[in-house]
Amino acid sequence: MRLVVQRVLEAGVRVDDTPVATIGTGLLVLAGFGKDDDETLPDSRRWNAMCDKLIDLRIFPDAEGRMNRSLREHGGEVLLVSQFTLYADLRRGRRPSFQTAAPPDTARNLYERLVHDIDARLPGRVSSGIFGALMHVSLINWGPVTLCLDDAELFPEASVAG
């Protein structure tokens, strides 16, 4: 699982020129799943650690302006957007290959579970795009602060099943 996390003042998703989701201050999260991610991932320590890390990242300012507060403490929202292109392979030629991305059905199930699990941790503060849709994503970066989280890099010792 890969997450690109952006701290935003606001963000939104439109599909066919129709607003689907909007948030105020918080995190825009692009979420992608790899071919090694499967239906057992949500039951793993790795999955829970990624969910907790996402909402507990201390990237919001405290009273002194230092990045010292989490989303949970700050009170912001989350907008989750599926993004299979996070698994693009650019080593050959000029056209990206997506062979390392999870199959669409698997990715859809994992994405929907991610939305559910983040919402369980932050009830009523989570919005999402539409899986597989051509989306227009808008945002106003705050900082900017952009972080890339890859479960295989952050938790190499944790097996997908463990």
Curated annotation (Swiss-Prot):
EC number annotated for this UniProt entry: 3.1.1.96
Top-level taxon: Bacteria
A GO MF label: tRNA binding
Major enzyme class: hydrolase
GO biological process terms held by the UniProt record: D-amino acid catabolic process
Subcellular location: Cytoplasm
Catalytic activity, as annotated: glycyl-tRNA(Ala) + H2O = tRNA(Ala) + glycine + H(+); a D-aminoacyl-tRNA + H2O = a tRNA + a D-alpha-amino acid + H(+)
A Pfam family that the UniProt record links to this protein: Tyr_Deacylase
Residue interval(s) of motif Gly-cisPro motif, important for rejection of L-amino acids: 143-144
Gene3D superfamilies, alphabetized: D-tyrosyl-tRNA(Tyr) deacylase
UniProt keyword annotations, A-Z: Cytoplasm, Hydrolase, RNA-binding, tRNA-binding
Alphabetized SUPFAM superfamilies for the sequence: DTD-like (SSF69500)
GO cellular component: cytoplasm
Major subcellular location class: cytoplasm
Written domain comment of the UniProt record: A Gly-cisPro motif from one monomer fits into the active site of the other monomer to allow specific chiral rejection of L-amino acids.
Similarity-based family: Belongs to the DTD family.
Function of the protein: An aminoacyl-tRNA editing enzyme that deacylates mischarged D-aminoacyl-tRNAs. Also deacylates mischarged glycyl-tRNA(Ala), protecting cells against glycine mischarging by AlaRS. Acts via tRNA-based rather than protein-based catalysis; rejects L-amino acids rather than detecting D-amino acids in the active site. By recycling D-aminoacyl-tRNA to D-amino acids and free tRNA molecules, this enzyme counteracts the toxicity associated with the formation of D-aminoacyl-tRNA entities in vivo and helps enforce protein L-homochirality.
Subunit structure: Homodimer.
Protein name per UniProt: D-aminoacyl-tRNA deacylase
Species this chain originates from: Nitratidesulfovibrio vulgaris (strain ATCC 29579 / DSM 644 / CCUG 34227 / NCIMB 8303 / VKM B-1760 / Hildenborough) (Desulfovibrio vulgaris)
